[in-house]
């Protein structure tokens, strides 16, 4: 912009000839009093001004009208600003009044953050004070992790690093493994070891309480004395005589009397259970084997494998359900989901029959007809 004194220029503002000083700006000449702000219409004079769409503005008027306004204090924003949900904010207004605050330290969150249970956290605050810790290595669980049946949280990679307890499915890291265990023995976690049935007196106390429970469900044993044995895996395999696989945990002890190669009678002597089972599983195995014993005592022979094993699994399942503790619910779920065509599918078929008929009627029909009720 320049001020000049010449002859008869025409003012763009009023269209009249200019006598005296005038302004040359925006490619035109102006009376000084006619070169005005497009907003307030007051002369701009020789001060700094802004141009927008070919129109002049006082700098203050320009910023007041054209600059974004802070959605919090409603004042114009002339420098850097933050946007949030389509609104603009002064940095200080945003940080003090708008930005999310860490649920732990209550300071503004300006960068990346974690959300947990609808609350926001600084990454460091979440990592150091909020994130769950791996039950095995203690590291904060910041990404995908595993939660097992027991609610134990741990790093996903540990699934391929540590063996699982043979009885409850918990992972067993090296520091929790039994140092004296033979390589042929199953891995047990500290929880299962803590309740393991290792001695016959222990076992007998628990076993004695089972028969009254089964009697109350209509399974009579006629006061026949049933012995209980605790055996190792080698002895259990001998007693099974190849009748079951390596996963067997118990066996019914029977004596078969034959005449002229014909079975004349079968006697039940008791049951044998693998030593070292956790107490809840021990009881469930005992109930299963007592199911086999009851079938023999009632003279029920020749059932299909799925029917006999399914019936015995049903007894264990009902026992676990009545016990209704974490361990029993875990074992009951294992029975429900067992993919084995004999034990798993057998249980599901027998369970459906018993549900349809009612358990007491189902047992009585089985006892009197000596065969599995029709599906």
Where are these regions (language model features)?
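Post-HExxH zinc-binding segment in Zn-dependent metallohydrolases
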Residues: 298-342
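Active-site scaffold of zinc-dependent metalloenzymes
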Residues: 243-283, 290-297
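Canonical RING-type zinc finger of E3 ubiquitin-protein ligases
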Residues: 16-28, 44-53, 76-87, 108-118, ...
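Pan-zinc metallopeptidase signature
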Residues: 131, 159-170, 180, 219, ...
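Short cysteine-rich clusters marking metal-coordination/redox-active sites
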Residues: 11-14, 37-40, 58, 70-73, ...
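Cys/His-coordinated zinc-finger cores
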Residues: 29-43, 57-66, 88-98, 120-130, ...
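A metal-dependent hydrolase signature that marks the N-terminal structural subdomain at the beginning
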Residues: 104, 117, 124-257
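Short metal-binding segments enriched for Cys and/or His
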Residues: 34-50, 66-72, 97-103, 129-132, ...
